């Protein structure tokens, strides 16, 4: 599978990540996470309390995506401290990126279609709806904040990525392809497979009969009450073009 990505963008991200993480710094962050947070990952992983240090995730995805450290090293470190049953969910989440890569490699038409769609949808970038969403100037305060966080830090909590994607697709009614492109542009850990397939899943194009619709109460709960977009989000998902592939 040949992934046609702008090499300059990837090179720029790699340089930024290398500035954030030397190998020793990445290993230090990994050990700190395993020692202080890994045992609570399963119960706390969906909470986004704002700053990374307040959350129960590792924040290592940029380092892993650029192979500063590998999944194997991370998994061995975790399993040297905990039984499999204690950290099963954490192990599953680390392996998701590998699963997505294999899935897309065996269904390369999904990527080809995505690239074609981006060309066909270019005209929408001139719309006010797209401009407001891509600049964080909507009427949904939490969405605007996430967009700013994405652009400034190159990172969003995984649960927040789902909320963002859902609002983009189902509330703002913008094509998932343009949202996926935005993530690819700004996320330091952006991966063509996991990013594309995750957006398709939220849109309802990945698993037949399944869409993801962000819920204001869910956002309030999992942000510790920081955010509550009451009466601002769509209650019905946009009809998907499901192909089940």
Spans of features found by a protein language model:
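C-terminal catalytic domain of photolyase/cryptochrome flavoproteins
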Residues: 3, 13-158, 166-245
């Amino acid at each position: 599978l040949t992934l046609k990505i702008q090499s300059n963008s990837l090179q720029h991200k790699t340089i930024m990540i290398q500035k954030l993480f030397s190998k020793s710094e990445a290993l230090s962050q990994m050990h700190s996470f395993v020692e202080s947070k890994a045992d609570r990952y399963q119960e706390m992983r969906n909470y986004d309390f704002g700053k990374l240090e307040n959350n129960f995730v590792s924040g290592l995805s940029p380092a892993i995506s650029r192979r500063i450290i590998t999944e194997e090293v991370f998994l061995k470190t975790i399993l040297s401290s905990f039984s499999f049953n204690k950290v099963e969910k954490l192990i599953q989440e680390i392996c998701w990126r590998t699963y997505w890569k294999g899935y897309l490699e065996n269904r390369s038409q999904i990527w080809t279609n995505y690239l074609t769609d981006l060309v066909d949808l270019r005209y929408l970038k001139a719309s006010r709806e797209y401009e407001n969403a891509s600049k964080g100037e909507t009427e949904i305060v939490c969405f605007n904040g996430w967009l700013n966080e994405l652009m400034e830090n190159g990172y969003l909590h995984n649960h927040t990525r789902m909320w963002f994607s859902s609002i983009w697709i189902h509330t703002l009614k913008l094509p998932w392809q343009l949202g996926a492109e935005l993530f690819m542009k700004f996320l330091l850990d952006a991966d063509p497979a996991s990013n594309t397939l995750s957006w398709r899943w939220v849109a309802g194009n990945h698993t037949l009969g399944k869409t993801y619709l962000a819920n204001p109460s869910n956002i309030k709960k999992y942000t510790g009450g920081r955010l509550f977009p009451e009466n601002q989000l769509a209650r019905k998902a946009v009809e998907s073009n499901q192909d089940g592939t």
